């Protein structure tokens, strides 16, 4: 699943395009 991240979340880190609540969430590239 996605993990909570700050604004440092980038596409290279596997960002989801959806905003789950207050923060964008990221999926680690290895998941």
Curated annotation (Swiss-Prot):
GO cellular component: extracellular region
Keyword entries, A-Z: Disulfide bond, Hydroxylation, Ion channel impairing toxin, Knottin, Neurotoxin, Secreted, Toxin, Voltage-gated sodium channel impairing toxin
Superkingdom of origin: Eukaryota
Keyword NADP listed: no
Molecular-function annotations in GO: sodium channel regulator activity; toxin activity
Presence of keyword Disulfide bond: yes
Intrachain disulfide bonds: 2-16, 9-20, 15-26
Localization in the cell: Secreted
Predominant place of localization: secreted
UniProt-annotated site: Hydrophobic/aromatic residue important for potent activity, residues: 8
Residue numbers bearing the 4-hydroxyproline modification: 28-29
Tissue expression notes: Confined to the epidermis and to the mucus layer.
Domain text: The presence of a 'disulfide through disulfide knot' structurally defines this protein as a knottin.
Further information: Negative results: does not show effect on rat Nav1.8/SCN10A.
Assigned protein family: Belongs to the nemertide family.
Biological role stated in the UniProt entry: Highly potent toxin against both insect and some mammalian sodium channels (Nav). It potently inhibits inactivation of insect sodium channels of B.germanica (BgNav1) (EC(50)=2.6 nM) and also delays the inactivation of mammalian Nav with potent activity on Nav1.1/SCN1A (hNav1.1/SCN1A; EC(50)=7.9 nM, rNav1.2/SCN2A; EC(50)=24.3 nM, rNav1.3/SCN3A; EC(50)=105.6 nM, rNav1.4/SCN4A; EC(50)=46.4 nM, hNav1.5/SCN5A; EC(50)=215.2 nM, mNav1.6/SCN8A; EC(50)=36.3 nM, hNav1.9/SCN9A; EC(50)=97.2 nM). 1 uM is enough to completely inhibits the inactivation, resulting in sustained non-inactivating currents.
Protein name, UniProt field: Nemertide alpha-6
Organism: Lineus sanguineus (Ribbon worm)
């Amino acid at each position: 699943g996605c993990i909570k991240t700050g604004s440092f979340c980038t596409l290279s880190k596997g960002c989801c395009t959806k905003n789950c609540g207050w923060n964008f969430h990221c999926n680690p590239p290895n998941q």
